[in-house]
A protein has these predicted regions:
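Acidic, polar-rich low-complexity tracts and alpha-helical solenoid repeat scaffolds
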Residues: 4-6, 13-148
Length: 148
């Protein structure tokens, strides 16, 4: 029992001092951004989302904002949170119309809505929205690499 308690206390001490935990508690958005990027690159999308959600409101206009909002949108996509992914990709596309990632963001935003489409016997509001979004994408990017 003592070994278990000791192991438990050591694990708490180790995990409570992790860079991720420090970033979560930090007031510095640069620390949060750096850690969120690291978590994203390590494919720990849930962790990166927690940090991106904290810094997103204050991050507009900063030099790294385009990259941050792209990773934020992608993290939602990769965690299969398609409602949020669709919204964030649309927001990215409208906020950064000259981005080199605009076509991909527009496509993934539209595709997010298609992932929400239920089976044919259920209400097809999401399906109709997906069709509209995909048609808008096709109209905007008729020669896209994503069509095919």
């Amino acid at each position: 029992m003592k070994k278990f308690l000791l192991l438990f206390l050591i694990s708490i001490a180790i995990f409570s001092c992790s860079p991720f935990q420090k970033a979560l508690k930090s007031e510095d958005s640069t620390v949060k951004y750096t850690e969120a990027t690291k978590q994203y690159e390590n494919k720990k999308y849930d962790r990166s989302l927690r940090l991106f959600e904290q810094i997103a409101p204050n991050f507009r206009g900063k030099p790294e904002s385009e990259d941050m909002f792209y990773m934020y949108s992608q993290a939602y996509w990769k965690t299969k949170q398609y409602v949020s992914a669709g919204y964030q990709f649309e927001k990215f596309a409208s906020s950064y119309p000259k981005s080199s990632r605009i076509e991909e963001a527009a496509f993934l935003g539209a595709k997010s809505y298609s992932k929400l489409s239920p089976v044919y016997s259920l209400d097809q509001v999401d399906t109709d929205k997906a069709i509209d979004k995909l048609q808008s994408f096709i109209d905007a990017y008729p020669n896209s690499q994503y069509l095919g």
